[in-house]
């Protein structure tokens, strides 16, 4: 049965009950008839002195929501149609509607109640105005709409191994099954002793200094712990240095915590290593910390020791805390060795994040951790804040914690994937070579993780809007990717794809991608 969302609107002294499906159909029909894109509507709204965001427009077009009355009037004005027709279809497309005297049956009592009650609207918090998370954003919403209509979408937008046939090691599943009866209650808010002990030993092998059990925290994935640590550290207006491109959760969490994310550049011409000169130039008296993502998402770059030592020197000179996102540290290829930056900074406050989601192909289990190391005296108050927030969420997923010790010990099956002949290794090589064969596309070879971040010749393809490019690719080839802007990259010239699908699927998708770029020119 069709689900209808009703709003009360007063146009020309008439109450109109609006069907959500009707509105999005009318909007898409009008835009198609007038050959108008979403980006055209957004630009037109700016010319009229109004603000209409990409996410808003995408949700209206996909039928996820209906705009407020003032926004509906703005859309009608831009598209030169009658607002009542656009919303409810009661009037001619190009004419203002007038009241009708058609006799109608008496409405059901519940409808009378709905029309007589004016319910206030609830808007999202203004704290979300500058938050971006396009890994699951408007283009993904459009893909979901297409799937609902029966389209088959190839999802190359997210590093989720399980749907592509990567299986959890049998020993891990067996261990969780055996321990489930003992996992029914809360654990210590920091995590199970066995899990934290295994994490401490792993951290010591990585060379992290001054690691203590009480400064290890398990979480429902690294994502929860990033948000927790940002809330514990940042006051309103505090600045934190974050790479560009970045994993967008860092920028989002810093913003939600009241901080101001400042992006330093990673240099594509230097294997996507951080530009240390640019990093230091962005530091002000308000800068509190810096973030590195190593191995990097979305570029797959693995930072060498000398680059990390340079970052440590910058942090030391300016007395900054270091946050290191190292979730892909066990997925390095081509002989590249991961060096934990905390191992180079025993005198600095460091927070290191890792987990099992990627290395053990168990993203759905939601198990990550963070380790506070180095100079803990200067972050004692921060640690109190972390403890407070950790206690407030009670504890992380206990069954997932129970398998950390097993997962970190013994044979690491991930190594079979990333060596020559391994599935991840070979698929990475294929995608890298196939992309470089496409005229107008260039790409730096990723050395770790699941992602590749190609560059498009924007002049050749006439690309000015990378979200529109992602939508065009989705509509024509049914391929879902993430635009470069979703990773806080300023130019509309990059996109990220995941090389997790099986080889035969990747071959088909890269052929489709080559065919798309062979003729694509953004209008």
Question: What does each model-found stretch correspond to?
Answer:
Residues 405, 421-432, 443-457, 491:
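Conserved glycine-rich beta-strand-loop-beta hairpin in the small C-terminal domain of fold type I
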Residues 120-221, 228, 395, 407-410, ...:
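N-terminal small-domain helix-loop-helix segment of the aminotransferase-like
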Residues 346-422, 432-434, 517:
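Conserved core segment of the aminotransferase class I/II
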Residues 232-254:
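Conserved PLP-anchoring active-site segment centered on the Schiff-base-forming lysine
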Residues 78, 205, 281, 462-464, ...:
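PLP-dependent enzyme catalytic core of the Aspartate aminotransferase-like
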Residues 262, 267-337:
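Active-site phosphate-binding strand-loop segment of PLP-dependent enzymes
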Residues 1-45, 107:
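A short, Lys/Arg-rich alpha-helix, primarily the initiator
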Residues 62-77, 93:
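Short, basic-rich loop-to-helix N-cap that marks the start of a DNA-contacting helix
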């Amino acid at each position: 049965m069709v689900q209808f969302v009703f709003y009360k609107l007063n146009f020309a002294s008439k109450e109109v009950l609006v069907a959500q499906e009707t509105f999005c159909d009318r909007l898409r029909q009008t835009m198609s008839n007038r050959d108008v894109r979403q980006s055209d509507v957004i630009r037109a709204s700016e010319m009229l002195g109004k603000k209409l965001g990409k996410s808003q427009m995408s949700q209206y077009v996909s039928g996820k929501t209906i705009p407020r009355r003032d926004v509906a009037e703005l859309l009608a004005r831009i598209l030169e149609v009658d607002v009542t027709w656009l919303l409810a279809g009661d009037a001619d497309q190009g004419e203002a509607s007038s009241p009708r005297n058609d006799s109608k049956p008496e409405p059901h009592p519940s409808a009378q109640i709905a029309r007589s009650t004016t319910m206030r609207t609830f808007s999202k918090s203004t704290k979300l105005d500058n938050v971006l998370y396009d890994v699951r954003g408007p283009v993904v919403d459009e893909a979901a709409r297409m799937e609902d209509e029966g389209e088959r979408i190839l999802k190359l937008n997210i590093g989720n191994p399980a749907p592509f046939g990567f299986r959890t090691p049998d020993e891990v599943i067996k261990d969780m099954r055996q321990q489930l009866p003992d996992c029914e209650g809360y654990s210590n808010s920091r995590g199970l002793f066995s899990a934290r002990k295994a994490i401490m030993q792993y951290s010591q092998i990585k060379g992290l200094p001054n690691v203590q059990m009480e400064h290890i925290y398990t979480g429902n994935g690294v994502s929860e712990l990033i948000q927790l640590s940002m809330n514990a550290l940042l006051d309103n207006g505090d600045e934190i240095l974050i790479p560009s491109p970045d994993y967008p959760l860092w920028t989002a969490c810093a913003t939600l915590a009241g901080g101001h994310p400042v992006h330093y550049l990673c240099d594509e011409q230097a294997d996507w290593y951080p530009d240390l000169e640019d990093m230091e130039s962005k530091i002000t008296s308000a800068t509190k910390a810096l973030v590195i993502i190593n191995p990097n998402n979305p570029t797959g770059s693995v930072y060498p020791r000398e680059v990390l030592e340079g970052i440590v020197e910058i942090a030391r000179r300016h007395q900054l805390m270091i946050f290191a996102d190292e979730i892909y540290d066990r997925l390095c290829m081509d002989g590249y060795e991961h060096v934990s930056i905390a191992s180079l900074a025993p005198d600095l406050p460091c927070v290191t994040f890792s987990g099992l989601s990627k290395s053990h192909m168990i993203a759905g289990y939601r198990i990550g951790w963070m380790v506070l190391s180095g100079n803990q005296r200067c972050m004692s108050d921060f640690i109190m804040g972390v403890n407070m927030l950790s206690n407030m969420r009670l504890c992380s997923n206990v069954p997932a914690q129970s398998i950390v010790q097993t997962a970190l010990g013994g044979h690491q099956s991930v190594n079979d994937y990333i060596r020559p002949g391994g599935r991840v290794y070979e698929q990475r090589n294929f995608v890298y070579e196939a992309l470089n064969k496409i005229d107008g596309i260039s790409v730096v070879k990723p050395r770790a993780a699941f992602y590749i971040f190609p560059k498009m010749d924007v002049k050749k393809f006439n690309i000015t809007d990378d979200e529109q490019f992602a939508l065009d690719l989705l509509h024509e080839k049914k391929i879902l990717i993430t635009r470069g802007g979703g990773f806080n990259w300023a130019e509309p010239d990059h996109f990220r794809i995941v090389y997790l699908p099986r080889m035969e699927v990747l071959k088909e998708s890269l052929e489709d991608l080559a065919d798309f770029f062979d003729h694509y020119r953004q209008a």
